[in-house]
């Protein structure tokens, strides 16, 4: 049986370099992934590659 509240949720990670405006192309790049609420209750910050900025930047979890 499934539990009432799912442990894994889908989150979006947004590039911080794109949101500050120092990039070559217009737009903001976002990754979609899942996280476990019990293991990581706080917001996630990962270093991922951004094709708009052409480098690895910090991507932060955003609200949906």
Curated annotation (Swiss-Prot):
Biological-process GO terms, alphabetical: translation
Write down the Pfam families for this protein, in alphabetical order: Ribosomal_L33
The UniProt keyword set, sorted, is: Chloroplast, Plastid, Ribonucleoprotein, Ribosomal protein
GO cellular component, as recorded: chloroplast; ribonucleoprotein complex; ribosome
Family matches, as PROSITE patterns: RIBOSOMAL_L33
InterPro entries xref list:
Ribosomal_bL33 (IPR001705), Ribosomal_bL33_CS (IPR018264), Ribosomal_bL33_sf (IPR038584), Ribosomal_zn-bd (IPR011332)
The listed locations are: Plastid, Chloroplast
Highest taxon listed in the record's lineage: Eukaryota
Gene3D superfamilies xref list: Ribosomal protein L33
| Annotated GO MF terms | structural constituent of ribosome
Is Protease a UniProt keyword of this protein?
no
Q: Does the keyword Lyase apply?
A: no
Q: Which family does it belong to?
A: Belongs to the bacterial ribosomal protein bL33 family.
The record's annotation in NCBIfam families points to:
PRK00504.1, PRK00595.1, rpmG_bact
Please state what the protein is called: Large ribosomal subunit protein bL33c
The protein's gene is named rpl33
């Amino acid at each position: 049986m499934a539990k009432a509240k799912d442990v894994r949720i889908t989150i979006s990670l947004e590039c911080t370099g794109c949101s500050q405006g120092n990039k070559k192309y217009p737009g903001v790049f976002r990754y979609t992934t899942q996280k476990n609420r019990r293991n990581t209750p706080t917001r996630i910050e990962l270093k991922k590659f951004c094709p708009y900025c052409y480098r690895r930047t910090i991507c932060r979890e955003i609200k949906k």
